């Protein structure tokens, strides 16, 4: 029971050490990834992993829950206070399970759901035909304007009036602009639909007051706690009090059994951190870094190579890069940046002619670098590295670019001393 991981399972310990090295020595720019504080790691690796706690605080189906009840209540209270919401359920194991619970609470199978098309930046759980949401519900989609790549609210209204959905989803996985939540709410009211906002990507910006909050406009709001919020990989549901009972029942027993109390403790820690000025500063640097990146990727040298920025810029933490006119496809560009030590993900762009495993775009995000401490100068440097690589393709001096990346990574050490604590047990 007391032997450290390195002694019990050196294979896994070795792989964890290698992954730690990868995170330290490269630049993480996948928009949905971040680095959690050590306090979050400690909470998630705590003895709460041993405790079963089906039900809600004060109404458990197991004994011995006197302490985990307090933990969950703290997490719920912090979530409500941070986002000024009437109620919160902190039990979803993931964003996808939170979304499944929302649909379970608001709809019955076969009813109509309207969301942003996956090909235009929507999420799998917003009605993609191979996902549970596309199999259980009658799904319609709105998209982006083919020229501006912006969501046209008049077109959304027209689609809603034609389709008459039970629920309208406002949210995205790869859309670089702020949504008009008031307009979505007005459309939902007009057609008698419920409005559900999935703010998984931009919740941290909302918490810091840098992005409009959907909470005053939506019936229900779901989010992940990682991404911009910088907490453990998990989900969270907020909303109006009138939906609390149906949401709670949809989570348990509708979607899950026992909650992961060690993860809920980690959520509580992350939500406390999200109310601090240090967190707000991090979000400001996240946002400014994305704008620096978008501006550099709109430069003449990049444009000459056929690379452009979808919608011409960004309002959030990510930039969507269009490679349709470039010699690179999404897979090739992802591999090229990986070779110089920058991790991104290939991503479809609107009207993408290539298959989803290849794509014609990249999704590039700034949260993890802001968490490491990057400011304007560093974001300008990494933006120039990416621009130079994409403009030059395989003809770029990749070794020189890799050296620049390595220097940036080593200037901002990550998880110093973590090996001794997490792997060796000292």
UniProtKB/Swiss-Prot annotation:
Pathway: One-carbon metabolism; tetrahydrofolate interconversion; Amino-acid biosynthesis; glycine biosynthesis; glycine from L-serine: step 1/1. The record marks 226 as: Plays an important role in substrate specificity. It holds the Pfam family SHMT. The keyword Zinc-finger does not apply. It is found in: Cytoplasm. This is Serine hydroxymethyltransferase. It is an enzyme of class 2 (transferase). SUPFAM superfamilies: PLP-dependent transferases. It comes from Mycolicibacterium paratuberculosis (strain ATCC BAA-968 / K-10). The lineage of its organism: Bacteria, Bacillati, Actinomycetota, Actinomycetes, Mycobacteriales. GO terms for molecular function: glycine hydroxymethyltransferase activity; pyridoxal phosphate binding.
């Amino acid at each position: 029971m007391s032997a450290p991981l390195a002694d019990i399972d050196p294979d896994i310990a070795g792989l964890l050490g290698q992954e730690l090295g990868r995170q330290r020595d490269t630049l993480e720019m996948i928009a949905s990834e971040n680095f959690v504080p050590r306090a979050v790691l400690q909470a998630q690796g705590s003895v709460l992993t041993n405790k079963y706690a089906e039900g809600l605080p004060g109404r458990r189906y197991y004994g011995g829950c006197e302490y985990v009840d307090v933990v969950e209540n703290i997490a719920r209270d912090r979530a409500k206070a941070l986002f000024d919401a009437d109620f919160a359920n902190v039990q979803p194991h993931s964003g996808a399970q939170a979304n499944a619970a929302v649909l379970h609470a608001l709809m019955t199978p076969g009813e109509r759901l309207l969301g942003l098309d996956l090909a235009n930046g929507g999420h799998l759980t917003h009605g993609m035909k191979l996902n549970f949401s596309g199999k259980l519900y009658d799904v319609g989609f709105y998209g982006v304007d083919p020229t501006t790549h912006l969501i046209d609210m008049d077109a959304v209204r027209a689609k809603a009036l034609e389709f008459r959905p039970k629920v309208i989803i406002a949210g995205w996985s790869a859309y670089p602009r702020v949504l008009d939540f008031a307009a979505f709410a007005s459309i939902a009211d007009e057609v008698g639909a419920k409005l559900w906002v999935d703010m998984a990507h931009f919740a941290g910006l909302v918490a810091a007051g840098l992005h409009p909050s959907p909470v005053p406009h939506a019936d229900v709001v779901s989010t992940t706690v990682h991404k911009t919020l910088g907490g453990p990989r998990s989900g969270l549901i907020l909303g109006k009090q009138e939906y609390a009972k149906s949401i709670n029942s949809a989570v348990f027993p509708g979607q899950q059994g026992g909650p992961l109390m060690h993860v809920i403790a980690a959520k509580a820690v992350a939500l406390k951190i999200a109310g601090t000025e240090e967190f707000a500063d991090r979000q400001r640097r996240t946002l400014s870094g994305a704008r620096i990146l978008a501006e550099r990727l709109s430069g003449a040298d990049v444009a000459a190579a056929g690379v452009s920025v979808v919608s011409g810029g960004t309002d959030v933490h990510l930039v969507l890069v269009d490679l349709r006119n470039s010699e690179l496809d999404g897979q090739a560009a992802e591999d090229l940046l990986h070779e110089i030590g920058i991790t991104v993900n290939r991503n479809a762009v609107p009207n993408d002619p290539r298959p989803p495993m290849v794509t014609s775009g990249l999704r590039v995000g700034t949260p993890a670098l802001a968490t490491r401490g990057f400011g304007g100068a560093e974001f300008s440097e990494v933006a120039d590295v990416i621009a130079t690589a994409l403009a030059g393709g395989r003809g770029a001096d990749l070794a020189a670019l890799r050296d620049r990346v390595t220097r940036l990574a080593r200037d901002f050490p990550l998880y110093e001393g973590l090996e001794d604590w997490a792997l060796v047990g000292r």
